[in-house]
A protein has these predicted regions:
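Catalytic Walker B motif of ABC-type/P-loop ATPase nucleotide-binding domains
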Residues: 181-185
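Conserved ABC ATPase "signature" region
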Residues: 123, 127, 134-152
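ABC transporter nucleotide-binding domain
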Residues: 199-296
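Conserved catalytic motifs of ABC-family nucleotide-binding domains
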Residues: 177
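Hydrophobic anchor residue at the start of the ABC signature
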Residues: 170
Length: 334
């Protein structure tokens, strides 16, 4: 049982989020003439806790259950089984109270009204949350200054770049001054400079005392931002620790990084059959390909690399210390 404590003049639970054995099953109808229903478990058994003031990461491959978990915690989906509390409120019984106290920031360009200005967008969402008119306009100004868009506040959102729209998403998610913010891949599709600015804003929010649950596909981002990270695979949490703690899963390995040209999918598949290869990832671009091979052998495997890639052009081979991404790959592929 989570005890209550005093904070900022009111009683609250010690944990901002408590998820206990959450499960979500969807009914999927298949067939054209003979239609049959199939039960699909999107989230099978998810349990974790998030402290107040923590930036907690939830990472996993596509279809692992990240978004479904977020939707249950933000009251957009009802769990099939299990329980969860958000800011001390039950996600099934206290829907309105939770929605008043949380913010949701999505990646991408959806969720904004592009034919009106940033100010008009924020006024609209402030009114939906019931923000008092006496503080609304001042808060909008503060938020637009925080995201660096005050000088473009009266321009139509359709004239904004993708990065500017993402910053406006952040302001929208903060308009009700939420205690807890859910960020679903907030830097997806952004160029490196804008993504870096977005990560800086996220850090500043934590410094201001906000609690954040972040989903991301970028392991370096989770490593940089998160106090703890949960890795979800096939609807279940397979690991939960600090970034440095997760790296211990691959402390006995090295990463052989091969930069080359002409590397094929068939050659990548060959590496997966090598006995001492724990995981393989490949970025097969048009002009340059990067192959990352996780193995306990390190430099001892170079001769095998050269043999398998004898028909490809190899520019460079490096032996690197494992990163959070390497730990992630090992956990989600094994």
């Amino acid at each position: 049982m989570t005890r209550k404590r005093r904070g900022r003049g009111e009683s609250r639970l010690e944990k901002a989020i408590v998820a206990g054995h959450l499960c979500k099953v969807f009914s999927v109808t298949k067939g054209t003439f003979r239609r049959t229903k199939t039960q699909v478990g999107a989230v099978k058994d998810v349990s974790f806790e998030v402290d107040y003031g923590e930036l907690f990461g939830l990472v996993g491959p596509n279809g692992a259950g990240k978004t479904t978990t977020i939707k249950m915690l933000t009251t957009m989906l009802i769990p099939t089984s299990g329980k969860a509390t958000v800011l001390g409120y039950d996600v099934q019984r206290d829907v309105t109270k939770i929605r008043q106290k949380i913010g949701i920031i999505l990646g991408g360009e959806r969720g904004l009204y592009t034919r009106v200005s940033a100010i008009d967008n924020l006024r609209y969402f402030a009114d939906l949350y019931g923000v008092s008119s006496s503080i609304r306009d001042n808060r909008i100004k503060e938020l637009l200054q925080f995201i660096g868009l005050w000088d473009r506040a009266r321009d139509r959102v359709e004239t904004y770049s993708k990065g500017m729209k993402q910053r406006l998403h952040i302001a929208r998610g903060l308009i009700n001054n939420p205690e807890l913010i859910f960020m679903d891949e907030p830097t997806i599709g952004l160029d490196p400079e804008i993504a870096r600015e977005t990560r800086k804003m996220i850090k500043e929010l934590v410094e201001k005392g906000k609690t954040i649950l972040l989903t991301t596909h970028y392991m370096f981002e989770a490593d940089e931002l998160c106090k703890r990270v949960a890795i979800i695979r096939n609807g279940e949490i397979v690991a939960l620790d600090t970034p440095s703690g997760l790296k211990k899963y691959v402390i006995d390995t090295r990463v052989v990084e091969v930069e080359g040209f002409g590397i094929t999918d068939k050659e990548v598949a060959e590496f997966k059959e090598v006995s001492d290869v724990l995981s393989v990832s490949a970025d097969l671009g048009e002009n340059k390909q990067i192959l990352k091979i996780q193995t306990p052998k390190g430099s001892e495997i170079i001769s095998e690399v050269q043999e398998i890639l004898k028909n490809s052009r190899i520019y460079d081979i490096k032996i690197k210390e494992p990163t959070l991404e390497d730990a992630y790959l090992r956990l989600v592929t094994n």
